[in-house]
């Protein structure tokens, strides 16, 4: 949390926890952030930074969905590769986080949703304290065994849209086995966010791994 040791006006002892949410286009990142906000906002002070290449569509979607008050959601237009904006040159996102913390210095959690990217996407440790990587079953049973930093190095790996498995010929047991092999001793969650399956597990992970609770 090197960037956030001193937040002007902050009265809480611990610095805000920055949670990066990444994954390919359509995997369910925005839905996950929306549901996390709606479920956690009564207990924690939350703000969100979204990333899109040429628009602020995810910011708009979260605002329309009522995830948080509009002023607590900021959209970043990266204007290029979404991977670069969260890793090689995260300055635009670091500045957005700073702006949000100027407005809400006592925020407990800053969710940073990346633009849709490939399996090589990772967050800079200067930008994110915890990383969650989301894929969806519809992308294919083989995705977990393809590896890539998002799958092997993320703090939490989420396999979303499990309800689609029978429609796309995916075997969830194979995906689970491949995931255990590719990221031994690292947690993962099988989820269907339409029914909230897996959501509580993600929240427990954020709260415990992020040291928000004992």
Curated annotation (Swiss-Prot):
Task: List the residue ranges of the region (Disordered).
Answer: 1-20
Entry-linked Pfam families: cobW
The record's listing under InterPro entries reads:
CobW/HypB/UreG_nucleotide-bd, P-loop_NTPase, UreG
Q: Which Gene3D superfamilies does the annotation name? A: P-loop containing nucleotide triphosphate hydrolases
Q: List GO BP terms, alphabetically.
A: urea catabolic process
* Primary localization class, coarse: cytoplasm
Task: State if Aminoacyl-tRNA synthetase is listed as a keyword.
Answer: no
* SUPFAM superfamilies on file: P-loop containing nucleoside triphosphate hydrolases
Question: Is this entry keyworded DNA-binding?
Answer: no
GO CC annotation = cytoplasm
Q: Main role?
A: Facilitates the functional incorporation of the urease nickel metallocenter. This process requires GTP hydrolysis, probably effectuated by UreG.
Q: What is this protein called?
A: Urease accessory protein UreG
Species of origin reads Leptothrix cholodnii (strain ATCC 51168 / LMG 8142 / SP-6) (Leptothrix discophora (strain SP-6))
Q: Which gene encodes it?
A: ureG
